[in-house]
From Swiss-Prot:
Pfam families: ArAE_2_N, FUSC_2. The keyword Transferase does not apply. Keywords: Membrane, Phosphoprotein, Transmembrane, Transmembrane helix. The chain crosses the membrane at residues 37-57, 75-95, 124-144, 147-167, 184-204, 630-650, 664-684, 688-705, 710-730, 733-753, 767-787, 797-817. Residues 567-602, 967-990, 1096-1125 are annotated as: Disordered. Residues 1-36, 96-123, 168-183, 651-663, 706-709, 754-766, 818-1219 are cytoplasmic. It is found in: Membrane. Residues 575-602 have a biased composition (Low complexity). The modification Phosphoserine is found at S1167, S1198, S1199. Residues 969-982 have a biased composition (Basic and acidic residues). This is Uncharacterized membrane protein YGL140C. Present with 1080 molecules/cell in log phase SD medium. GO terms for cellular component: endoplasmic reticulum; membrane.
C-alpha cells in the first residue's frame, strides 16, 4: 500500500469519527481568533489596567458569547448576555449595599479581617444578608432555566456577576464592582460581534435563501420520485414516458424525514433573522407564506409516499428482486388490508389514468423549477443550487448561469400559473371521463379505490400547493422588479424585523421552539446539527402540557363553572322604591339595593368565600403548573449553597477565597441540568474537560518558561482551544467544552496576574473545584428530586398515545348523528395541528431518552432487547401521527361526503370505530404510564372499520338501486357470501347499532352513482379510509409491542381461560362417530408459551394473493392468545345436518364425487374457533364485500379444503401427540 493511499485511508477514518465541514471549520476559526485576542489583551498591562479588578472575565465572556454562529445568533446571544449583566450587577450592588450598612460607617475603612476581629456580629449579619440574596438569586436562576432554556443566556451571566461580586471584599465601593464586572464583559461582547461580522460573516438572510432553495429541491425531488414510482408500474414498458426508472422504496421512505427536517430548518432560520439588520431588495418576511405552504406540502408528499408504500405491498413486488434498502425500509406488519385487494383492478385504472397524471405532473414540475429560479434570483442565491428535473423525456427546462441578472425577464410567471391552472382543470375533467367508462364494481368503496383516491387527492393538493407557491413567488418577483428600477442605492433597503409586529417581538422575547436545550442556547445554532453525535441532555416536557392538550374533563369543567357563575335569580317581586318601569324590571335579574341589608351581607359573604376559593384554586393550579420549576430551583439553591456555604461564614470566608471558591460554584452550576441526562456520564465528561483544560494551561505556562516567552505560550493555547471549540460547536457536549476552554485561560491567568498562587497551585485548585463542585451537583441531582430517563421515556410514549386518541376524537365529527356544516372546521384543525406538533416533539424526546436509558444503572437485566422494542414503538407512533396529519388536512381542504350526507345512517358505525381506536389508545396510555398489564378484552377497530365500509357500500346501493342494478347486469353475478347481497340491513341492525333509512324521497333520486363517488368529498373519504386502515394496523402492532413491555391480563381458570369449542370442533372432525354416541374424551389443549407465537405456527406454504387459504396472521387486540373471527356466522336451524360425509371427514381429503361438508357446518366450526388470522380467502373476501370468483378461484364451494386453518392446526397438533 502506497503512502498516498494510507494517508487517504487515515483521512477518511478521521472524518468518520470527527466529521467537519467547511462551515464548522470557519466557525471554529472565528471563535479561536476571538478568544486568543481576548487572552492577548489580558497579557498587556496597559489594557489590563483598564479592565478593572477581574480581567480574567474577558476570555470567559468571549467563550460564552462566541462568534461561531450566524449574525442573528450572535446578536441574540449578546442581547441576552447584556440583559443578564445589567440586572445581575444591579442586584449584586444592592445586596452589597445592604450588607455594608450592617457594618456601619467603617465599612470602607476596615478590611474584612479587621471587621471579623472588631465587629464580628455586624460582619456576620452582613454575610447573612449576602447569603439570603445568594439563595434568592440561585432559586430564580433555577426557576428561569426550567421555564425556558432560552433564558439560560440571561441567568448564567447574572449568576456569574452576583456570585463573583459577593466574593469580593466588602470594603470595595460600588464603582469598583461595577467597573470590574462591566468593562471586560462589554468588551468581550463587542469583540465577538466584531469578529462575527469581519471574519467569514454568515448572514441569516442569505442563509435563509439557501435553506429555502435546498428545501424546495428536496420537495421537488420527492414529488417527482413518488409520482414516478406510483404510475410507472412497468419500468421496462416501451410506452413509458419517464426517462428514469423508479427509485427504490427505501430511498423514497427516507425522503420523508429529510424533507421534514429541511422545512423545519427554514422556519428556524426565518425566526433567527429577526435579530439582524438586512440590506437587501426584498424583506426576508416575504418567505413566510412560502414556508407555511411548504409545511402543508410536506404533509401531502408524505401522503404520496405512503400510497406508494401501499401500492408496493399490493402489487407483491417482493416476488421480484428487491434492493437492500427496500428490504430494510419495508418493516411492516404482515396483516396489511391492502394485500387482499385486487391488483388487476388497480393496474387497469392506473393504465387509463397514466397520461392524465403525467401531463399534470410535467406542468407542476416545471412550475416548481421556475419558482426556485425566481426565489434564487430574488434573494441573491447562486442559481447553481437550483436542481432541475431531468426525468421527463419531452422536458425542456431552461438553464441559467450564475451571472444571469435578467433571469426574471426571461420567465413569464403569470403564464406558468395559467398553465398549471389549466392542467389541473384538465386533469379533473379527464379523470372524471376516464373513470365513468368503468363499471360500478370498480367504483364501489374498496381497498383499490381507497388507494387510488389517496394518491389522487394528495396529488391534486400538491398541485394546489404549487399553485399557491407560484402566486407568492409572483408577488416577490414584482417587489424585486420595483426595487430594482430604483437603482442599486435606492432599491436596497435596511430591514430590521424585531419590532415589526407583536408576533416577532414575542419570538424575540420568549423564543418559538420548545425543544431547544441549554446546549443549543450556548451553541447559538438551532438546526439540530450535531454531526452524528447523540444528545447528552434532553429538555423535559412540562407537566401541565398534557392537561392542556389532552384533558377534556378540564375544559368541560371550565364551561360548567362559567355557566353557573353567569346564572342570575329571577325577580319574583318588585323592590321597594322602584315602582316605575315595572315591565322592564319584571323580566330583569334580581337587583340588590342598599335597603336589602340581609341580602347584601349574604351576597358579600358568598362573594368573599367565592373569591377565597378562587384564590386557593389559582394557587393550587399555579403550584401544579410550576412543580418542575420549584424542583429545579430548589436543586440549584441546595447544590450551590452546599458548595459555597463557607463564603458566608466569617471564620471560613478567607480560606474559601484563597482556595478559589468561585471556581467551585462555577463548575457546580454548569454540572446541574434541568433536563434529563446521563448524570454520571455528563459529570464525567465535564470533569475530563476541566482537567484537560487545566493541564493544557499548565503546559502552556511551563512552555513559556515563567512568562519569558508569551508568544509561544499564546500559540500553544490555540492548539488547546481548537478541539474545545470543535466539541462546543460540532457536538452536543457543549458545557464540557466550555469548561475546558475557560479552564485553559483561567488557570494561566491565575498565575500570570498578580496573585499568591503559582501555576501548579492553580492547576490543583482547579481540579479540586471540579471534584468538589461537580460532586456536590451530582449528589444533589441524584438524591434530591431525581429524574430518570427510563421513566421519562414511558411518560413520553404514554403522552403520544393520548395525543393520538385526542386527535382521533377531534378528527371525527358528528358522532351523535347531528347535521354538520363542515366535516373539519378551522378551529378543530388548529387543535389537531397543535397536538400533532406536541406529539412529534414528544417522540423526539423519547428517541433521546431511549439512548440515555442505556447510561443509567439498571437492576432488571439488560436494556438492549427492550430498546429494540421501544424503537419500534416510537416508529409506529410516528407513522400513525403522520397519517392523521394527512387525512386531517385532506378533510379540511375537501370535506367528507359520508359525514356531510350519509351521517344520519352511518354514524353508529363511525362512532364504534372511533370509540374503539380511542379506547385502545387510552388503554395503551395507561399501560405505559402505570406499567400495568393490558386488560383481557379490548375492542377491535379493524372489524368496526370493515363494518363501516360495508355500510357505506350498502347505503350507496340503497340510494341508487336502479342504476346499480343496471350496471351490475353487465358485471359478474355477486358471490353468495358477499356482504353486499342486496339486503337492506345486516345482522348488526338487530343490535340497535344502525338506524333504518327513510325510504321516502329516495325513490326520486336519479343521480348517477358514478357522479357521486367521483365527487371531491367522496374521494376525500376514500383517501381517509385508506389511511384509517393503516392507522388501525399500526395500532394493532403497537398493541402487540405493548404486551411485550407491560404484559397482559389473562384468565387463568374458568370458561374464558382457553377456547373450549376448539376441542369440540376437533373431535367433531376426527371422531364423529364417538362424538355422536357421546364417547368423546376431552383433550388437554396446549396454551401458547408466549402471546406472540402466532407467526411460528402459521407456516403452511407461501403467501399468495390468489390463494384460497391465506396464511397471514391477523392478531386481534382482544387478547393475547385467542383471535377473534372476522365474519362469525350464526347457526341456522333450517339446515339439514344429515348431509355429512363421514368418510371425507375422517380422511381430511377432498373427494372427487362425494359431497363435502355443508356450508353451515363449516361456518359454524369457524365461528366457534378462536383464530381469526387463519381464514380462507372466501371469508376475507366476504368481509371486504368483493365478489370476483375469478380472483378468488373458488371453484368448489363445498370442498373440504375450505376448512378453517385453525381447525387444520388442531388436527396437526393431534397427530403430533399421537406420534
Amino acid at each position: 500500500m502506497s503512502l498516498k493511499s494510507k494517508l487517504t485511508k487515515i483521512q477518511k477514518l478521521w472524518l468518520y469519527y470527527f466529521p467537519c465541514d467547511r462551515i464548522l471549520a470557519k466557525r471554529i476559526c472565528k471563535s479561536t481568533v476571538n478568544t486568543t485576542v481576548a487572552f492577548i489583551f489580558c497579557l498587556i498591562p496597559k489594557i489590563t489596567a483598564h479592565l478593572g479588578a477581574a480581567p480574567a472575565m474577558l476570555p470567559m465572556i468571549s467563550v460564552i458569547v462566541h462568534p461561531g454562529r450566524r449574525v442573528g445568533g450572535t446578536i441574540h446571544g449578546a442581547i441576552y448576555c447584556i440583559t443578564g449583566l445589567i440586572f445581575g450587577l444591579a442586584y449584586a450592588i444592592f445586596g452589597r449595599f445592604l450588607a455594608q450598612r450592617c457594618l456601619g460607617s467603617s465599612w470602607h475603612e476596615l478590611t474584612e479581617a479587621q471587621q471579623h476581629v472588631l465587629h464580628y456580629k455586624r460582619y456576620e449579619a452582613g454575610l447573612a444578608i449576602l447569603a439570603v440574596f445568594e439563595v434568592i438569586m440561585l432559586f430564580f436562576h433555577g426557576w428561569m432555566r426550567s421555564v425556558s432554556h432560552y433564558y439560560f443566556g440571561i441567568v448564567f451571566p447574572l449568576f456569574v456577576v452576583v456570585h463573583f461580586a459577593f466574593m469580593d471584599p466588602l470594603n470595595e465601593t460600588a464603582g469598583t464592582i461595577a467597573k470590574a464586572y462591566s468593562t471586560p464583559f462589554y468588551l468581550g461582547i463587542a469583540m465577538s460581534i466584531f469578529w462575527n461580522l469581519v471574519l467569514f460573516p454568515e448572514w441569516g438572510t442569505t442563509y435563509l435563501g439557501n435553506t429555502t432553495i435546498d428545501a424546495m429541491n428536496e420537495l421537488h425531488k420527492s414529488i417527482d420520485y413518488s409520482i414516478n414510482f406510483f404510475i410507472a408500474v412497468d419500468p421496462h414498458n416501451s410506452s413509458q414516458l419517464y426517462s428514469r426508472d423508479p427509485v427504490s422504496l427505501g430511498k423514497l421512505l427516507k425522503m420523508k424525514s429529510l424533507i421534514s427536517s429541511k422545512v423545519n430548518n427554514c422556519r428556524v432560520v426565518l425566526h433567527e433573522c429577526i435579530y439582524e439588520f438586512t440590506y437587501a431588495y426584498v424583506s426576508p418576511t416575504k418567505l413566510k407564506p412560502i414556508i407555511s405552504t411548504l409545511e402543508n406540502l410536506t404533509v401531502f408528499i408524505n401522503g404520496l409516499v405512503n400510497t406508494c408504500q401501499l401500492e408496493f405491498i399490493l402489487l407483491a413486488r417482493h416476488d421480484n428482486k428487491l434492493r437492500p434498502d427496500d428490504v430494510a425500509a419495508l418493516t411492516l406488519p404482515k396483516n396489511k388490508e391492502i394485500s387482499f385487494a385486487n391488483a388487476e383492478k388497480l393496474l387497469k385504472v392506473i393504465d387509463k389514468l397514466h397520461p392524465v397524471i403525467y401531463s399534470l405532473h410535467r406542468t407542476m414540475s416545471e412550475c416548481m423549477y421556475i419558482a426556485k429560479l425566481v426565489l434564487a434570483h430574488a434573494f441573491d442565491v447562486k442559481v447553481s443550487r437550483v436542481h432541475s428535473c431531468s426525468m421527463f423525456k419531452d422536458g425542456n427546462f431552461p438553464t441559467f448561469s450564475n451571472n444571469a441578472n435578467n433571469l426574471p425577464n426571461d420567465v413569464d410567471i403569470q403564464n406558468k400559473i395559467n398553465d398549471l391552472k389549466q392542467a389541473l382543470e384538465e386533469c379533473k375533467a379527464k379523470f372524471k371521463s376516464e373513470m365513468l367508462s368503468f363499471d360500478i364494481d370498480i367504483m364501489s368503496p374498496s381497498d383499490e379505490m381507497f388507494l387510488l383516491s389517496s394518491f389522487l387527492l394528495n396529488f391534486r393538493q400538491t398541485a394546489d400547493s404549487t399553485l399557491v407557491i407560484m402566486e407568492s413567488v409572483k408577488d416577490i418577483l414584482v417587489k424585486r422588479q420595483i426595487q430594482e428600477k430604483k437603482g442599486w442605492l435606492r432599491g436596497k433597503r435596511l430591514w430590521f424585523l424585531v419590532l415589526t409586529n407583536y408576533e416577532t417581538f414575542s419570538i424575540w422575547l420568549k423564543g418559538d421552539r420548545n425543544s431547544v436545550t441549554e446546549n443549543d442556547t450556548l451553541k447559538g445554532t438551532f438546526n439540530g446539527n450535531t454531526n452524528g453525535f447523540a444528545h447528552d441532555t434532553v429538555i423535559r416536557r412540562p407537566d401541565y402540557e398534557e392537561n392542556e392538550l389532552l384533558s377534556q374533563k378540564v375544559s368541560s369543567n371550565k364551561n360548567i363553572v362559567k355557566d353557573d357563575a353567569s346564572l342570575d335569580l329571577p325577580m319574583t317581586s318588585e323592590p321597594k322604591g322602584n315602582s316605575s318601569s315595572t315591565s322592564d324590571t319584571s323580566s330583569s335579574p334580581l337587583t340588590l339595593t342598599k335597603t336589602t341589608t340581609f341580602g347584601t351581607n349574604r351576597t358579600s359573604r358568598r362573594q368573599g368565600r367565592f373569591s377565597f376559593m378562587s384564590m386557593l384554586i389559582s394557587i393550587d393550579k399555579f403550584c401544579e403548573v410550576s412543580h418542575p420549576h420549584f424542583r429545579f430551583g430548589f436543586q440549584v439553591a441546595i447544590a450551590l449553597m452546599l458548595a459555597s456555604f463557607p463564603m458566608f461564614i466569617p471564620k471560613t470566608r478567607q480560606w474559601y477565597i484563597d482556595y478559589r471558591g468561585t471556581w467551585i460554584g462555577f463548575v457546580c452550576i454548569l454540572c446541574l441540568e434541568p433536563s434529563v441526562g446521563g448524570t454520571f456520564w455528563v459529570f464525567f465528561l465535564r470533569a475530563v474537560g476541566v482537567i484537560f483544560g487545566a493541564a493544557w494551561g499548565y503546559l502552556s505556562y511551563v512552555a513559556a518558561v515563567n512568562q519569558t516567552n508569551p508568544y509561544l505560550e499564546t500559540v500553544i493555547t490555540v492548539f488547546g482551544a481548537i478541539p474545545g471549540f470543535y466539541y462546543l460547536l460540532g457536538t452536543p457536549y457543549v458545557k464540557a467544552a466550555i469548561i475546558e476552554i475557560i479552564s485553559i485561560y483561567i488557570v494561566m491567568l491565575a498565575a500570570i496576574l498578580p496573585s499568591q498562587d503559582d501555576i501548579l497551585t492553580s492547576f490543583a485548585k482547579r481540579c479540586l473545584a471540579v471534584g468538589y463542585g461537580g460532586g456536590v451537583a451530582l449528589i444533589v441531582q441524584v438524591f434530591f428530586f431525581p429524574l430518570k430517563a427510563r421513566e421519562q421515556l414511558n411518560e413520553e410514549i404514554s403522552f403520544v398515545c393520548g395525543c393520538i386518541s385526542e386527535m382521533e376524537l377531534l378528527y371525527a365529527t358528528g358522532l351523535e348523528g347531528e347535521q354538520v356544516a363542515s366535516s373539519m372546521s378551522e378551529e378543530k384543525y388548529k387543535k389537531i395541528e397543535k397536538i400533532s406538533k406536541s406529539a412529534k416533539e414528544a417522540l423526539a424526546r423519547a428517541t433521546a431518552y431511549k439512548g440515555l436509558t442505556r447510561q443509567e444503572p439498571r437492576l432488571k437485566g439488560e436494556y438492549t432487547e427492550l430498546e429494540n422494542v421501544f424503537t419500534q414503538v416510537i416508529f409506529i407512533q410516528k407513522q400513525i401521527i403522520e397519517r392523521i396529519d394527512t387525512i386531517s388536512l385532506l378533510r379540511k381542504q375537501n370535506g367528507s361526503a359520508v359525514i356531510e350526507e350519509f351521517n344520519s345512517v352511518v354514524y353508529p358505525y363511525r362512532r364504534q370505530m372511533v370509540g374503539s381506536i380511542s379506547c385502545l389508545m387510552r388503554a395503551l396510555q395507561e399501560a405505559f404510564i402505570n406499567k400495568t398489564p393490558l386488560p383481557q378484552f379490548l375492542p377491535s377497530a379493524r372489524i368496526a372499520h370493515r363494518r363501516l365500509i360495508n355500510k357505506v357500500r350498502q347505503t350507496l346501493r340503497i340510494r341508487y338501486p336502479g342504476q346499480i342494478s343496471n350496471l351490475s347486469d353487465k358485471a359478474r353475478k355477486p358471490n353468495e357470501g358477499d356482504y353486499a347481497d342486496g339486503k337492506d340491513e345486516d345482522d348488526d341492525d338487530n343490535e340497535g347499532l344502525v338506524m333504518k333509512m327513510n325510504r321516502r324521497g329516495q325513490a326520486n333520486t336519479t343521480a348517477n352513482p358514478h357522479e357521486y363517488v367521483l365527487k371531491e368529498k367522496f374521494l376525500s373519504w376514500n383517501a381517509s379510509s385508506a389511511a384509517s386502515e393503516e392507522i388501525i394496523e399500526y395500532i394493532e402492532e403497537l398493541l402487540n409491542l405493548t404486551k411485550i413491555l407491560v404484559g397482559v391480563n389473562e384468565f387463568k381458570y374458568g370458561f374464558l381461560s382457553r377456547p373450549l369449542y376448539e376441542d369440540w370442533a376437533a373431535e367433531a372432525v376426527t371422531g364423529f362417530d364417538n362424538f355422536i354416541n357421546g364417547k368423546s374424551n376431552p383433550m388437554n389443549t396446549r396454551r401458547n408459551r408466549t402471546p406472540f407465537d402466532g407467526t411460528s405456527i402459521i407456516s403452511e406454504g407461501n403467501e399468495s394473493l390468489q390463494s384460497t387459504n391465506s396464511n397471514e396472521s391477523q392478531i386481534s387486540p382482544d387478547s393475547t392468545r385467542s383471535y377473534e373471527p372476522e365474519c362469525p356466522v350464526a347457526y341456522e336451524k333450517n339446515d339439514n345436518p344429515a348431509a355429512l360425509n363421514l368418510l371425507r371427514i375422517a380422511s381430511h381429503k377432498a373427494g372427487q364425487n362425494a359431497d363435502g361438508l355443508p356450508k353451515t357446518f363449516r361456518n359454524r366450526a369457524f365461528s366457534i374457533t378462536s383464530t381469526s388470522g387463519q381464514l380462507s380467502s372466501l371469508s376475507r373476501h366476504s368481509t371486504l364485500g368483493n365478489a370476483d370468483p375469478n380472483y378468488l378461484n373458488d371453484d368448489d364451494e363445498s370442498s373440504d379444503d375450505d376448512l378453517p386453518l385453525a381447525l387444520k392446526m388442531v388436527l396437526s397438533h393431534m397427530k403430533e401427540k399421537k406420534d
